[in-house]
């Protein structure tokens, strides 16, 4: 039977931020069985607003987006939803911005095209690691 199961624990919430609508759609379709997708942002400003409204457990953020890119999104999301774990997404294998994003608070980095199961695992691990860092 498909649908809501009141006995099952709630799925973790996920915010997706990528300027490419095809990527946003594919990520949503790929991850909707393991996560409750609470928003799909096209730029840093929209990602911050959606994070403030939904307080997601984890945010998957593209490095290169309009409105300040992933760096602005991570700083802004950290300000409005400090418990949200951030995972950086990039098409480039060696993106020079990734180091800055990790320093800014990203929990992990993945490349676009990562296998769906591996991506879900990275997102879950980021959520598990976030409370330990927040408590430290």
Regions found by a protein language model. Give the residues of each.
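Non-catalytic signal-transmission and effector/linker regions of two-component phosphorelay proteins
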Residues: 1-13, 120-136
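Two-component/phosphorelay signaling modules centered on CheY-like receiver
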Residues: 7, 21-39
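Acidic, metal-coordinating helix/loop segments flanking the phosphotransfer/catalytic sites
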Residues: 40-58
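Acidic catalytic/metal-coordinating carboxylates
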Residues: 43-46, 67-72
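Short amphipathic alpha-helix used as the core "switch/output" element in two-component signaling
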Residues: 49, 71-83
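The short loop immediately C-terminal to the conserved phospho-acceptor aspartate in CheY-like receiver
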Residues: 57, 63-64
